[in-house]
């Protein structure tokens, strides 16, 4: 039942455990389970502006295939390091790396105008997008879909 499934999620002691519970659900693969986990970590207005789970987007991430390829592009060949370790390093050192590279990164701010670092979950996404960007820019691959503009929708004005 859904109640039993959700109870397993509530009993989980880490985001990685929640991910495994989600993956165990019929129809949930690695990608969907991770995306649902990430969504469950956002604060909900109907839940008092707190997330359903007691974890943050910086506690754990599951690198998908694109992120793994992005990490491989960043590292020297045959470096024996766990992908999550690389993502955590990027998260911890992002500000000093932007400074070292003389990049004026446009960090987002929270509701109190405090600058927010790029979360571990978003670093995972960035690594995937980095991989796609490099393969397209170097002509070694293409995007999944070709962009075609849709026809404008015309609304009747009364």
What are these regions (language model features)?
Residues 1-26:
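Helix-hairpin-helix/helix-loop-helix acidic hairpins
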Residues 5-9, 18, 71, 86-90, ...:
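Generic structural signal of hydrophobic/aromatic residues within well-ordered alpha-helices
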Residues 23, 53-54, 117:
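A general structural-boundary detector
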Residues 37-103, 109:
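Phosphate-backbone recognition surface of nucleic-acid-processing proteins
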Residues 98-158:
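Low-complexity, acidic/Ser/Thr- and charged residue-rich accessory regions of DNA metabolism proteins
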């Amino acid at each position: 039942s859904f109640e039993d499934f959700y109870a397993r999620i509530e009993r989980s002691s880490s985001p990685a455990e929640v991910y495994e519970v989600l993956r165990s659900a019929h129809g949930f693969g690695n990608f969907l389970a991770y995306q649902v986990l990430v969504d469950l970590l956002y604060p909900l207005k109907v839940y008092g502006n707190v997330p359903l789970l007691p974890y943050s987007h910086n506690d754990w991430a599951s690198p998908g295939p694109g992120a793994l390829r992005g990490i491989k592009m960043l590292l020297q060949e045959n470096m024996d390091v766990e992908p999550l370790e690389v993502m955590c390093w990027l998260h911890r050192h992002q500000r000093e790396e932007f400074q070292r590279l003389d990049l004026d990164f446009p960090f987002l701010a929270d509701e109190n105008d405090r600058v927010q670092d790029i979360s571990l979950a978003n670093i995972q996404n960035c690594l995937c997008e980095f991989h796609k960007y490099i393969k397209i820019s170097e002509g070694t691959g293409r995007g999944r879909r070709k962009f075609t503009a849709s026809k404008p929708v015309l609304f009747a004005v009364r």
